[in-house]
Amino acid sequence: MRAEIISVGTELLLGHTINTDAAHVGRALSALGMDLLQVHTVGDNAGRLEAALREALNCADVVITTGGLGPTDDDMTKETVARVLGAPLEEHKDSLRRLREYFGSRPIAANQLKQAWLPRGSTAFPNRAGTAPGCAVPGKPGQWVILLPGPPSELLPMLEDSVMPFLQRMGGAVIASFMVRTFGIGEGSAALRIADLTEGANPTVAPYASDAEMFVRVTAKAENAEAAEALAKPVVDAVRGRLGDVVYGVNVSGLEAVVVEQLRQHRRSLAIAESCTGGLLAKRITDQPGASEVFGYGLITYANEAKTRLLGVPEEQLACYGAVSPQVARSMAVGVRERYGADYGLGITGVAGPGGGTEEKPVGLVYVALSCSNAVWLRVLRPQGRYLGREWTRRLASSHALDMLRRHMAGLPVEAGWADGLPQD
């Protein structure tokens, strides 16, 4: 099935709000094996929305709109869809009941009540996080327009609870989708290794990059879940085999989830000392369920005095080599492990930017160290080409720290480099 997305909102068009809705919907469509043709963004203008909708209906089996379902005058998506499809708005009794339950004893303004009116023939999607229901409106045979609310906190539950099951039923097939997640290989190298696998129609294999990682989604369709999984799993195994030990998991939420689970299984503990990452690594760890079992201490030692007092980094080492140096990174990793009684210590120091760099130590240079009782490992992240920003540098450094620990606990070489000219030892 072919799909298009129309994102509605002047705030999106002008860049005042980042359009995360399109990314969420696009990922959902990909998981269902649908072919996403285009993403349109239109302002709060009925004429332009109508033009975009008519254009999309000429090409797609499913058109998904996001935004414009609220109670204000500039929320006009339903009215426009109703006009284009010739499906006048009608009061939807169940949606009205839910709206009244939401407000309880509070009075409901007249403009709020319009949220309970849906195009004739709609399949309603309840909104468990807000007031505006979504809906699917039939167009010509085999064609649907799906209307979703704009706030991600409302859109995401509706996607999961209602829209994806609805599209699966309309597609007449059960979908099995597997996400192979990697760290340590670029999209170009990965694509070359699995090029022949991406040519298949069922399962489909789609690589893409995000946040310094590379993912491969394998999606299969069949009459039932068991048959779909049976189609997908040999291809998943082939992808894993081609990519090797840069694969850190399938259908896992991230490196941090894998590392926390490894620590729990090995009954090991972790302490962290951060400088340029400012606590991001500790946050990623503590976001995971069960982190309290394996993670006891996370220190942000930004100042040299803090590195010495809290971690035992020698003053003469800081004076001789500077805070951004392999020597200090190693001392941070060893110090945090020894002083706070952990099995593993991670230390990060660098120049996250945008200022503070020198010719000798440019912006983007980061040292990441891992310490255990009998060894210390180091990775050096050197800027490659243009500087990609402070947040990118911090995220990349924290991912390298997690990957070093993952690889050690999996019995893999810790100091393995990166492909595609990305940061390496």
From Swiss-Prot:
Family per similarity comment: Belongs to the CinA family.
Name recorded for this polypeptide: CinA-like protein
Origin species: Desulfovibrio desulfuricans (strain ATCC 27774 / DSM 6949 / MB)
